[in-house]
Amino acid sequence: MNQRSYNIFFHLHTISGIIISAALFVIFFAGSFAFFRDEIANWQKNKEMPAIETGITINIDTVLDSLNNTYQLYGRDIEIGKHYNERRIDVNLSASKDSTASEESKKGAFFYLDTNTFHTYNYQESYTLGEFLYRLHFFAQIPYPYGYYLSGFVAFFFLFALITGILIHWDKIVTNFYVFRPKAKLKTIWTDAHTALGLIGFPFQFVYAVTGAFFMLSAIMAAPNIFFLYDGDQQKMYEELEYTEKPEALSYEKLKTIPSVEKYVTNTKATWEDFSISHIHIHNFGDKDMKVSVEGELNKKEKFTGNGKIVYQVSTNKILSKRNPFTETTYLDGVKNVLYRLHFGDYSGYSLKIISFLLGLISCFVIISGVLIWLVARDKRHIPEKKRKFNKWLVTIYIAICLSMYPTTALSFIAVKIFPFADKAFIYQFYFICWLILSIIFICKQSLYSINRYALLIGSIIGFFIPISNGIITGNWFWKSYSENLFQSFFIDIFWLVLASITLLVSFKIRKNQYKTFNSSKTS
């Protein structure tokens, strides 16, 4: 590569990276914890689920009987789904299509149903710390759609930074990978770490940049298609992409008896081996034109993209359509499922989740080291003092905001365990207020050494108290959880003990003289 091209790619890499650095750190840090969303949710609620996802297992007839006691179901479309490995399933009731129905029946409803107690919860009540961290990694807390678009554009620029980063290191990609000079000057140490760990994490980061941009910017990309290909009919496009189903008209002829829906679920599950049910759609409940659609997927070890579906006509007990997950996976199914599987990392058990978590933290380190390289490169005598001070203040703010996430997250685990009725409002207020306070404290310290060391140290100390708080409040000490096969509770406790031990060790390894480059001003 000639020098001119190298300089262009280098500056593009630097500019694109520094612009998105803080937002990108939040995405990777929160996203790393989001791999364990279900485990965190069940640990918080003290409700154990099998480590292996089994889909919907509750008797659907029992669910419908329970719903019918509260809601008039005739003429409604009912969707029952299970998206996460929790005890709760989500239930979506459409407004009744019966024009003679009561005003109450003409209102839709969405809630979560506990499959053990049959208690219902709205979204705010069902909110967990796992859900919060999952949604934080694509900025869902920012009003829709701005948070989604922000995370999508961050992912897009991250993809740009990845490609330019590989290009500028291309000529020495092998030799530089093996170079690490711990006794060299600070910029060299950061550069070696940034290069080596960046190359290790490149495939992981590339996958998440592509899939993240796709998920978050798909609405923008879809807009021209809706206008030109579907004449502005958004519903039609979603139907063809199989995100929604075509509405069925009501015949206004009530069935004398409602047949068992569970038998259709059982029949579908028995049709294919290792098939778990994920969604049940009931159209026109109680009507002559009532249809039941049962969807699910094969065990991911059996087939990576094995989605199956059977649609039944209730009045005749006939199968209207059938999609074999072994032989009839469409191109559309393949694309959607591959992108989802790659992004969520849910196709190979805990080993893949742990590896993905570690790669996510490595990505956080790559981001931090990149910012510090940028600072050291601009801390030169020929650069005006005002610019140098501004650069140091900027990086101090960046690092303070990023690293204060660790103790904030650890403290939030204890908070949701101490306050068992913590809902969405509580988690929002606690997390963001703690994050703000810690960020301000670290910024006021004006010391990169103090921020790095004490963020890790405080986070580690709090992290050690997480399994202790769980043991005191619930009685599920990790050794007891292990002996009673409460795997998710055991996993989260051990997870924090290991993570806190590692970060505590790292905090003790940080030395003040490593930051002597910054001693020329208050931000040293």
Segment roles from a protein language model:
Residues M1-I40, P145-D233:
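Internal alpha-helical transmembrane segments
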Residues N2-R4, I8-H11, G152-L199, F357-S404, ...:
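Juxtamembrane interface at the cytosolic side of transmembrane helices
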Residues I401-I414, K424-I443, I458-I466:
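Generic alpha-helical transmembrane segments
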